């Protein structure tokens, strides 16, 4: 028969083990309950703020909403500017309160109020559970901080965090796939032109180079000037302009200002020769025409003869033998509407 001391000694380990297991179970159960409650409360006590100015700061929003209750946090989603990596405020925000009473009061009191000269909208935020699940990626701004962003109201409303500085949705920076897509597109554009630069295309046979033209002369005017020699086409070399300016000019039905020279093509060599002989040196208004034959230059520079003997030389790389550099034509600057066959590969006397 065991003594009382032996019985206590034998049962002690089981008693301690039972107590430890019970305390662990209780702690796990309590933590599970606590993990669900704050998230649900954060979702229930949020309001959506719209029509904000992009210059409005968190502190200004917090100051306004603290007039109706205690503000737990303020979230301003950001969005990525199209075709860039710069982030700008999306013009909305989310304010989280501690209770439903403050939420109702904020909606009733602050909806329609003016903040930074903007009449804001205050509404109940949609719970996260009702929002569609979307992929989210993180990126960092120049300071190494994770910026807030939102490509839609749904994404913005799903933002969570523990403080005002680290609480918002993160921006989606251009991924490597997107970057590759841009590079691929650029390569395709380059592929069409052979290289990144605009290659000069050879002029049709029997073409001439004409300088001393008015900068306001149009293609039609140039062709009419040589009408007696049966020209097949005429093109003015135009000034380089940004693409958006070119689009505006075309929308207005206007022609870009010329550079004072152009090219005219003829049906046969006889008409070309007559045009050069009769029009070279002719006075047109205050200007004197210089008319020369536009042909391929077969010789370039010493070591490049064999390499480029069959390739057309861009007009920007060569000029008439007795024409100044100021009138040197660039193939990329001739009217883009009729590029093929218009730009001179080279011009010689």
Swiss-Prot record:
The modification Phosphoserine is found at residue 152. Residues 45-127, 206-296 form the RRM domain. The keyword Phosphoprotein applies. SUPFAM superfamilies: RNA-binding domain, RBD (SSF54928). One of its GO terms (biological process) is mRNA cis splicing, via spliceosome. Gene3D superfamilies: 3.30.70.330. Keywords: Chromosome, Cytoplasm, DNA-binding, Meiosis, Nucleus, Phosphoprotein, Repeat, RNA-binding, Telomere. GO terms for cellular component: chromosome, telomeric repeat region; cytosol; nuclear speck; nucleus. Its main location: cytoplasm. GO terms for molecular function: RNA binding; single-stranded telomeric DNA binding. Residues 168-179 have a biased composition (Polar residues). It is found in: Cytoplasm; Nucleus; Chromosome, Telomere. Residues 121-208, 298-349 are annotated as: Disordered. Residues 181-191, 298-310, 327-340 have a biased composition (Basic and acidic residues). It comes from the Eukaryota. Pfam families: RRM_1. Binds single-stranded telomeric sequences of the type (TG[1-3])n in vitro. Has a role in meiosis. This is Single-stranded TG1-3 DNA-binding protein. The gene is tcg1.
